[in-house]
Amino acid sequence: PHLNENTHLLFSYHGLPISHVKRIDASKKHCQKVANCCEIACDANALCYGRHCSETTHAVVERLGLTDEQWSMSYQSRLGPVKWLEPATTSKVEDLVNRGIKNIVVVAPAFLADGLETLEELDIELREDFLEMGGEDLTVVKCLNDDDQWIDGLESLVRKRLDPITA
């Protein structure tokens, strides 16, 4: 119900410092050394958070049938002076507004339940910034929280994991 031809879908993931992401690259030759390193599936980034965010985004984009112009991806919740995964959500929203995009739907796939990062950072602070930048409508999709289908699915997963233990 949130998407239409005049809406841009922004996937906002929790950010991580680059130093944390680089630790996963056992080769020490891929992460942040190869252009678009998170977009390339290889052994060096098999456990990479950025790669998993990218794969999740592309899977949803494909299922929704979106064009490249209809979506983008960013990272939020930065702290301190260290370098973090990019682009930052606020910077990405500013870029979108500067490109003439006035209607944005934000989804935060890394968050299962709403908390400060979604309720405060996205739904309040980002919305205020977006409107000040000249945007018109920003919708933040609620997290799964206690949605019946999510709880049923989680219960099913837990039961499958417990069955071998309790059998």
Which sequence ranges carry the predicted segments?
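Extended amphipathic ligand-handling, pore-lining, and cofactor/metal-binding catalytic surfaces
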Residues: 1-167
